[in-house]
């Protein structure tokens, strides 16, 4: 697979993670470099590892995995999005709000947004080319976009301020719905 094709694949796979990093940026009150790095590393690493896992599984499990991967992504993103919306409407302590820096939350979001990368890895297993190059490029592009996305999201969160978590929750649910509909055969473009 040539580098240009892999770059476009990487950008496509990174799009959902970028959108989620924007949402994460909305929720961070005091942005610091280490917070953006943590989010970007989670997404970049998962996006880099999942194609390798998919490639390793190869054609043997393609039909099995593709029959339910979209439901997992939809469920995880809808759950977290719904939780964000619910928590933004509560008048509870701030520490109970959506925390995009929590390792459990980050892992869940990273898995949900990298399921397409797993499927892409299965597809890559039938092509000639370097899986190492593909995984590296996918990981670095996702890392870069997510790092920038956290800062952009934070900036918009500062500007819009009130109830931005509702917007973030809706974005996550929409991403999950998009993944589900695309895998069910609906074209959204």
Curated annotation (Swiss-Prot):
<keyword id="KW-0812">Transmembrane</keyword>
<dbReference type="InterPro" id="IPR003810">
    <property type="entry name" value="Mntp/YtaF"/>
</dbReference>
<feature type="transmembrane region" description="Helical">
    <location>
        <begin position="8"/>
        <end position="28"/>
    </location>
</feature>
<keyword id="KW-0997">Cell inner membrane</keyword>
<keyword id="KW-0406">Ion transport</keyword>
<feature type="transmembrane region" description="Helical">
    <location>
        <begin position="39"/>
        <end position="59"/>
    </location>
</feature>
<feature type="transmembrane region" description="Helical">
    <location>
        <begin position="106"/>
        <end position="126"/>
    </location>
</feature>
<dbReference type="Pfam" id="PF02659">
    <property type="entry name" value="Mntp"/>
</dbReference>
<feature type="transmembrane region" description="Helical">
    <location>
        <begin position="166"/>
        <end position="186"/>
    </location>
</feature>
<keyword id="KW-0813">Transport</keyword>
<dbReference type="GO" id="GO:0005384">
    <property type="term" value="F:manganese ion transmembrane transporter activity"/>
</dbReference>
<feature type="transmembrane region" description="Helical">
    <location>
        <begin position="65"/>
        <end position="85"/>
    </location>
</feature>
<dbReference type="InterPro" id="IPR022929">
    <property type="entry name" value="Put_MntP"/>
</dbReference>
<comment type="similarity">
    <text>Belongs to the MntP (TC 9.B.29) family.</text>
</comment>
<comment type="function">
    <text>Probably functions as a manganese efflux pump.</text>
</comment>
<feature type="transmembrane region" description="Helical">
    <location>
        <begin position="131"/>
        <end position="151"/>
    </location>
</feature>
<keyword id="KW-0472">Membrane</keyword>
<keyword id="KW-1003">Cell membrane</keyword>
<protein>
    <recommendedName>
        <fullName>Putative manganese efflux pump MntP</fullName>
    </recommendedName>
</protein>
<dbReference type="GO" id="GO:0005886">
    <property type="term" value="C:plasma membrane"/>
</dbReference>
<keyword id="KW-0464">Manganese</keyword>
<keyword id="KW-1133">Transmembrane helix</keyword>
